[in-house]
């Protein structure tokens, strides 16, 4: 069985991949994540997911390398990680009462055969109307500065929503496990039949 590499140091993605109970290692890809001029959200997350997976191929030459990246879109604007409270407050104010679309790019690169599978998995988040006090309270308690959209859906962020819409809730956290399982199966690796030694 080819070994699996997660091209990420995100504790959230690592925890998600652990759900599949397949052995893997994590490694940090070093890529430029700057969006290209005129690049839409779907093209951006697919390009970044593929770039992250391919970036590790020189060190992992006979592996299945998983790359993932996520952006959120409000209106026609791509919104990234807030990095601080001022930006997070602005993002949540803009999202209040609206639908925010998330796109998670997923790539599985077989470094031995040089074949790659990739998708952009959509997920919609419908925010309820939020008060300033709720936004402040949430940001104070959870400090989601590293999260696209300024929330952690796996934590207190769930209280910000009216409803969620998508085929895989793991997509919102950063790693679409349903799609990943399908990709792994195409490479001959089924998480349900892998023996962990």
From Swiss-Prot:
Q: What does the record give as the active site?
A: 69 (proton acceptor)
Would you say which domain of life the source belongs to?
Bacteria
Task: For this entry, list what GO says about its biological process.
Answer: nucleotide metabolic process
The prosthetic group or cofactor this protein requires is: a divalent metal cation
Keyword Ribonucleoprotein in the entry? The reply is no
Swiss-Prot/TrEMBL site (Important for substrate specificity) positions: 12, 70, 154
List the record's Gene Ontology CC terms alphabetically: cytoplasm
| Record has Signal as a keyword | no
Ordered alphabetically, the record's keywords are: Cytoplasm, Hydrolase, Nucleotide metabolism
**Enzyme type, top EC level:** hydrolase
Q: Which reaction does it catalyse?
A: N(7)-methyl-GTP + H2O = N(7)-methyl-GMP + diphosphate + H(+)
Q: Name the InterPro entries for this protein.
A: ITPase-like_fam, Maf-like
Give its E.C. classification number: 3.6.1.-
Q: Which Pfam families match?
A: Maf
Chief location bin: cytoplasm
* Localization: Cytoplasm
As one GO molecular function, the record gives: nucleoside triphosphate diphosphatase activity
Family the UniProt entry places it in: Belongs to the Maf family. YceF subfamily.
Outline what the protein does.
Nucleoside triphosphate pyrophosphatase that hydrolyzes 7-methyl-GTP (m(7)GTP). May have a dual role in cell division arrest and in preventing the incorporation of modified nucleotides into cellular nucleic acids.
Name listed for the protein in its UniProt record:
7-methyl-GTP pyrophosphatase
Organism, as annotated? Pectobacterium atrosepticum (strain SCRI 1043 / ATCC BAA-672)
